[in-house]
């Protein structure tokens, strides 16, 4: 922000002609005597910390007014102070906030209109402090925190609701159960924990994911085994949502902040954003798939009989400029993959019905990923008062206690939402699935359908991520595994589902036949034909968390039955072994992974050909 402060005998102006960005309802001519005139230019860089810039400007003007003993202030928008001006959508609220902030300090404040060609006359007093210029610069470049200028502050009430519909003081739940850990974190009473989360070591030691030093902090590189898990999760969500009626789309990762709807939605979100210049356009990298899907919906011809309409995108990638010190492992990233569904509903009752369906999908993903989920439901007081019976219904159907947060008024785009979270090894929540009822975006983005009489309706929109970001799901799975006596991935997500270990070279050909037969039946199976001891091969299979390990020796070749170590039935130092045929083993694994997606091996079938990545 640029300021030119003139201590004036008088300032008078008259608005002559509108520009295309002229504000309406302003005072078009005025005069003030013995005032501090503040010629002001709001710059594009001020978007990085608008609130901070305004607070600094208030202090600078207040300081100068005190030095020259001025009690009256005139704020005069003056574009000629800068060659890099902010958009009107930012500049006008910033000028109003500057005016209101100075008025709150006890000054008599006037503001000249924005976006008009004006004539003005000014008489400078001519003393040493009568002409001063100030440049106010925001914080770190590239990191934008939406300040939601002019937003209302809400009060928050908290309680716990149990499936019987009763409400309870949340203090009774401040324990170390998974739900208690969520309550403590949300209420700000969680004990501080130190050290690195368990999943960080596991993601690297198992050669799944690693940091990419040549990229920005919080951007990861995916090795073949991690890439396979990630792809299977994407397949899983698509297979889950297609039968539900979701229609897949793909949209850009960057958007023009000159679009008023996009700017307002970004500002509502309130998270750090990547913003940059493309020629003279202010752009941002998306933090979710809302922008692209809403743009598609805005251009569609929607009739009531096509609702509810569900649109899905695997947002690869989304971006949030998290603080460097907060970025860690897969839990908090700057670049991530988000399964994102938006449902356009006829009205609020239909939105609430879809909410129930999508919440059920969220709970199902927790079971399929073998992660224990706990819940926090949030809504406005108005929504709760009107729909208390429905809130009790979803708690009952979820069959678990929920932390309930009641906001005195709406400060976000949603009227109600639910967040499901896993708990990590340090008793901290990992937010994953979410469902939200958005009551603002259809109006903001001009998304509508028409009644039979031609009346337009701007309907509620549900935001749903049935899993949360893929990275956080993997984080939750690894954190859960870190607490197990015998760590094991869900078999359908295991990069290698079975491994064949020949005892000696003479057993290798038969072991190869078994390996090929299992792969032919849709089992990810590899062969450890290396010249190593059987003990070492079996130990390494355990370190790789292979669910089924088949040792082939003379007995197995003669009997045509396999000796299989089953990881999920084993205990520390007590491997569980079972004899079965090749077809029986394949049937066991297929039964265990029924209904889940399958992809073949992403690594060589022979261990002697596998490279080390970390």
Swiss-Prot record:
KW Protein biosynthesis (keyword) present: yes
One GO BP: threonyl-tRNA aminoacylation
Major enzyme class: ligase
GO cellular component: cytoplasm
EC number(s) per entry: 6.1.1.3
Signal peptide as annotated in the record: none
Alphabetical list of HAMAP family matching this protein: Thr_tRNA_synth (MF_00184)
Protein name in the entry: Threonine--tRNA ligase
Organism, as annotated: Methanoregula boonei (strain DSM 21154 / JCM 14090 / 6A8)
Lineage: Archaea, Methanobacteriati, Methanobacteriota, Stenosarchaea group, Methanomicrobia
Gene: thrS
């Amino acid at each position: 922000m640029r300021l030119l402060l003139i201590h004036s005998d008088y300032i008078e102006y008259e608005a002559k002609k509108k520009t295309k960005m002229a504000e309406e309802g302003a005072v078009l001519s005025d005069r003030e005597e013995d005032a501090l005139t503040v010629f002001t230019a709001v710059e594009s860089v001020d978007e990085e910390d608008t609130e901070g810039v305004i607070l600094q400007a208030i202090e600078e003007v207040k300081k100068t007014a005190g030095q020259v003993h001025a009690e009256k202030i005139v704020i005069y928008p003056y574009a000629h102070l800068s060659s890099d001006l902010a958009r009107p959508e930012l500049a006008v609220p910033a000028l109003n906030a500057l005016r209101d902030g100075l008025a709150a300090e006890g000054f008599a404040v006037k503001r000249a209109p924005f976006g008009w060609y004006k004539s003005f006359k000014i008489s400078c007093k001519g003393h040493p402090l009568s002409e001063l210029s100030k440049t106010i610069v925001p914080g770190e470049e590239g990191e934008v925190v939406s300040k939601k200028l002019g937003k209302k502050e809400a009060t928050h009430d908290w309680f716990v609701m149990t499936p019987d519909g009763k409400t309870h003081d949340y203090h009774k739940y401040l324990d170390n159960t998974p739900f208690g850990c969520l309550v403590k974190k949300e209420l700000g009473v969680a004990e501080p924990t130190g050290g690195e989360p368990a999943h960080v070591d596991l993601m690297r030691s198992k050669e799944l994911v690693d940091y990419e030093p040549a990229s920005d902090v919080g951007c990861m590189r995916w090795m073949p085994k991690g890439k396979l898990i990630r792809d299977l999760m994407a397949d899983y969500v698509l297979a889950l949502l297609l039968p539900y009626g979701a229609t897949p789309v793909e949209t850009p990762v960057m958007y023009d902040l000159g679009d008023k709807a996009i700017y307002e939605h970004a500002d509502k979100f309130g998270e750090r954003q990547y913003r940059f210049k493309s020629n003279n356009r202010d752009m941002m990298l998306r933090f979710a798939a809302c922008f692209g899907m809403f743009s598609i919906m805005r251009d569609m011809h929607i009739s009531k009989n096509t609702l509810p309409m569900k649109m899905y995108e695997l947002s690869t990638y989304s971006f949030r400029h998290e603080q460097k010190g907060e970025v860690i492992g897969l839990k908090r990233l700057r670049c991530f993959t988000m399964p994102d569904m938006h449902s356009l509903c006829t009205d609020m009752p239909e939105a609430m019905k879809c909410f129930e369906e999508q919440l059920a999908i969220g709970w199902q993903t927790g079971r399929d990923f073998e992660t224990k989920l706990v819940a926090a439901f949030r809504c406005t007081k108005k929504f709760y008062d009107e729909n208390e019976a429905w809130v009790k219904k979803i708690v009952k159907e979820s069959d678990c206690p929920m932390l309930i947060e009641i906001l005195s008024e709406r400060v976000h785009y949603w009227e109600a939402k639910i967040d499901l979270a896993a708990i990590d090894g340090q008793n901290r929540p990992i937010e994953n699935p979410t469902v939200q009822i958005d009551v603002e975006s259809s109006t903001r983005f001009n998304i509508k359908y028409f009644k039979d009489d031609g009346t337009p309706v701007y309907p509620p929109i549900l935001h749903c991520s049935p899993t949360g970001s893929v990275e956080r799901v993997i984080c939750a799975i690894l954190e859960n595994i870190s607490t197990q006596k015998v760590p094991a991935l869900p078999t359908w997500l295991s990069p290698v589902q079975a491994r064949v270990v020949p005892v000696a070279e003479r057993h290798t050909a038969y072991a190869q036949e078994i390996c090929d037969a299992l792969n032919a039946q849709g089992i990810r199976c590899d062969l450890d034909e290396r010249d190593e001891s059987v003990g070492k091969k079996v130990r390494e299979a355990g370190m790789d968390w292979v669910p089924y390990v088949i040792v082939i020796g003379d007995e197995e070749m003669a009997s045509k039955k396999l000796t299989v170590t089953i990881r999920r039935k084993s205990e520390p130092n007590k491997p569980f072994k079972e004899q079965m045929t090749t077809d029986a083993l394949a049937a066991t694994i297929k039964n265990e992974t029924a209904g889940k997606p399958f992809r073949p091996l992403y690594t060589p079938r022979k261990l002697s050909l596998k490279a080390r990545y970390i």
